[in-house]
Amino acid sequence: MENKFYKNLNSESILQIYKLGIFPMAKSRCDEKIYFVNPKKRALLPIKDFHVSKSFSRFIKKKPFYITVNKNFKKVINRCATENRKDTWINKTIENHFNNLHEIGVAHSIECWKNDKIVGGIYGIAIGGCFFAESMFSSVSNASKFALINL
């Protein structure tokens, strides 16, 4: 999609494009430019119909991690951009915009902790009754899934 939003990109314009089903991406972490994706279809996971396997349910019952919400948004988005990845669509511009969205209460993170260290997490934007999960990371097996389950 043409970058018609790019010149005036701010928290409000990002929210407006999300409401249209469009989302920003970068070609790489070091690319300063942002382009906008307008897919014909978007995946939707209704939370009430979300199925958790029996084996993962058993894993959850062991309480392998503890969860916090919005405790360290900046760390979560940064680790989503850098953790175990050669490259990412999350450049510094996008990271900064999402940090601003977090400061105004629209972007949120769920953090998974083990032994006082963040070992997994997910972040996204909440608009109305929808949560647009943008990315997640895990440095310990199943931590990002555990964060997703705790949305």
Regions found by a protein language model. Give the residues of each.
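N-acyltransferase acceptor-side catalytic subdomain
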Residues: 1-151
